[in-house]
């Protein structure tokens, strides 16, 4: 699951703290938008001059299932922000940092309908992604 990616970060990446926070942010985002097709091929790493780092996020689309493809912690893949928050230590994050990240993600996705309108996405197209 996601903790396998976290383990890779711990063992191989530079800026471990930043990469772990970014991974956690992506898990929270996937839960918030209903992207449950979040298998290992949707996560990558880039080798930079300073070392390995998470690649930019890609293939993050709502699929609206109740469970993630990957475990969000050591025991469940249920799409649940409380479960993610309660597992913050498994991502080597202090709880207040995890709360901040989840809060930022919630703020970022809350106005998706307004953004869809500004980008001229049809109501029919936007409704497909209603969350």
Go through the PLM ranges and name each one.
Residues 1-131:
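Anionic ligand-binding catalytic core segments
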């Amino acid at each position: 699951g996601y903790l396998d990616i976290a383990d890779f970060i711990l063992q191989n990446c530079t800026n471990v703290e930043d990469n772990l926070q970014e991974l956690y942010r992506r898990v929270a985002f996937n839960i918030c938008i209903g992207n449950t097709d979040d298998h290992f091929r949707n996560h990558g790493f880039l080798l930079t001059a300073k070392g390995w780092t998470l690649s930019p996020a890609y293939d993050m689309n709502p699929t609206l299932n109740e469970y993630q493809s990957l475990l969000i912690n050591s025991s469940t893949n249920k799409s649940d922000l409380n479960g993610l928050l309660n597992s913050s230590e498994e991502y080597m994050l202090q709880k207040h940092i995890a709360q901040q990240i989840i809060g930022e993600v919630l703020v970022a996705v809350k106005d998706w309908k307004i953004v869809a309108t500004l980008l001229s996405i049809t109501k029919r197209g936007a409704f497909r992604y209603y969350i």
